[in-house]
């Protein structure tokens, strides 16, 4: 499988829904999944998973046909709604009074959520945000092919909201043969910058693709993060080598499995490489530091269709007076300033200003201003 894989396109705004009476209400996660299914972000999926594919993904990290897919993309409905549905019929998708699409129902089944939690998230602990969300959502899954009949009008970042076909076009226009994708749900701190620029030394372009779907409550809000990315790129990155666009999916916090998922999706957006750092898509202490890198050894680059780039934990070294990692710095822990999104968030929420070894001053200014605004509106 190469990176020029065929993109699924299931957007049809002329689709006749006038005769379809039944409807399924979508929550924000299902709504963002619907968009990514339709625009090809989740290629080769053509709909919400039926039982065969669901079981296969949960147990083997592959679809029933053998291709790699690590996160079950499911459509949960209540028992009450499920009783009114039957296989073979078309049902409308609604959210906030709008009809967004249609599903051709192929499957209605009750999943074993405990098994899903254990295999996908490696825990059944409800303190884990992914597990908590899994248990909170309804208990019956509906599988089937979808059509997106209406594009979302209220995207919070319209100029940065590009479909995979558009990002591929953009990379082509820029003449980029190799593109590295970077996934983030945090403001970019100096450790991220170091990793991104190290990767940029060996490829033509960097695709900064922050996730702006549903995240946990203590993550920094997407609008504040977007502003922080803008000032960072403006001041510290070569403009012709970086492209910023949002990833509208929800965060699953599934660690290693989500790292595979994030790589596959970035392949669909047109990336040839994908950065996997320490504890990618992790939360708390549920996953080992490099577990999200180790999981890639189960798959060949050919079947993934994208090359992962693994980076060690980086830090600021007071002796080197530079960003470094254990691969490039001989000094001991006492000389290392450890940077993390969690640490930056913590300092900011306590009203402390992160040092310049942590974050660029322009970024810090944006974050402080944004978080003050957030406190005022709460």
Swiss-Prot record:
Pathway: Sulfur metabolism; hydrogen sulfide biosynthesis; sulfite from sulfate: step 1/3. Its EC number is 2.7.7.4. The keyword Manganese does not apply. CDD domains: ATPS. This is Sulfate adenylyltransferase. The keyword Nucleotidyltransferase applies. It catalyses: sulfate + ATP + H(+) = adenosine 5'-phosphosulfate + diphosphate. Keywords: ATP-binding, Nucleotide-binding, Nucleotidyltransferase, Transferase. The gene is sat. GO terms for molecular function: ATP binding; sulfate adenylyltransferase (ATP) activity. Belongs to the sulfate adenylyltransferase family. It comes from Bacillus anthracis. GO terms for biological process: hydrogen sulfide biosynthetic process; sulfate assimilation. Pfam families: ATP-sulfurylase (PF01747), PUA_2 (PF14306). InterPro entries: ATP-Sase_PUA-like_dom (IPR025980), PUA-like_sf (IPR015947), Rossmann-like_a/b/a_fold (IPR014729), SO4_adenylyltransferase_pro (IPR020792), Sulfurylase_cat_dom (IPR024951), Sulphate_adenylyltransferase (IPR002650).
């Amino acid at each position: 499988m190469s990176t020029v894989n065929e993109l699924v396109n299931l957007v049809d705004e002329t689709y006749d829904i006038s005769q379809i009476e039944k409807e399924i209400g979508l929550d924000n996660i299902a709504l963002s999944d619907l968009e990514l299914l339709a625009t090809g972000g989740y290629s080769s999926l053509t709909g919400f998973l039926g039982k065969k594919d669901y079981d296969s993904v949960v147990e083997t990290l592959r679809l029933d046909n053998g291709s790699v897919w690590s996160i079950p993309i499911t459509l949960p409905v209540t028992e009450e709604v499920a009783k009114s549905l039957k296989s073979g019929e078309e049902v409308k998708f609604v959210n906030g009074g709008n009809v967004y699409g249609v599903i051709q129902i192929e499957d209605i089944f009750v999943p074993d959520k405990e098994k899903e939690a254990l295999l996908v998230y490696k825990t059944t602990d409800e303190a884990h945000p992914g597990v908590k969300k899994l248990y909170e959502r309804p208990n019956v899954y509906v599988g089937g092919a979808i059509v997106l009949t209406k594009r979302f009008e209220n995207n919070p970042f319209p100029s940065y909201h590009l479909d995979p076909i558009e990002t591929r076009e953009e990379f082509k226009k820029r003449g980029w043969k190799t593109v590295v994708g970077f996934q983030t749900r945090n403001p970019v701190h100096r450790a991220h910058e170091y990793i991104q620029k190290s990767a940029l030394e060996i490829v033509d372009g960097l695709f900064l693709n922050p996730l702006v779907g549903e995240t946990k409550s203590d993550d920094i809000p997407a609008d504040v993060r977007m502003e922080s990315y803008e000032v960072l790129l403006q001041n510290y990155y070569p403009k012709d080598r970086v492209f910023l666009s949002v990833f509208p999916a929800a965060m699953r916090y599934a660690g290693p499995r989500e790292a595979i998922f994030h790589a596959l999706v970035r392949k669909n957006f047109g990336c040839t490489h994908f950065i996997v750092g320490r504890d990618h898509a992790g939360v708390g202490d549920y996953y080992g530091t490099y577990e999200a890198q180790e999981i890639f050894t189960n798959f060949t680059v050919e079947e993934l269709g994208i090359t992962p780039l693994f980076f060690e934990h980086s830090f600021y070294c007071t002796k080197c007076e530079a960003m470094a990692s254990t691969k490039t710095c001989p000094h001991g822990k006492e000389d290392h300033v450890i940077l993390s999104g969690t640490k930056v968030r913590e300092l900011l929420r306590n009203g402390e200003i992160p040092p310049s070894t942590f974050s660029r001053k322009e970024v810090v200014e944006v974050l402080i201003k944004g978080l003050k605004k957030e406190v005022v509106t709460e």
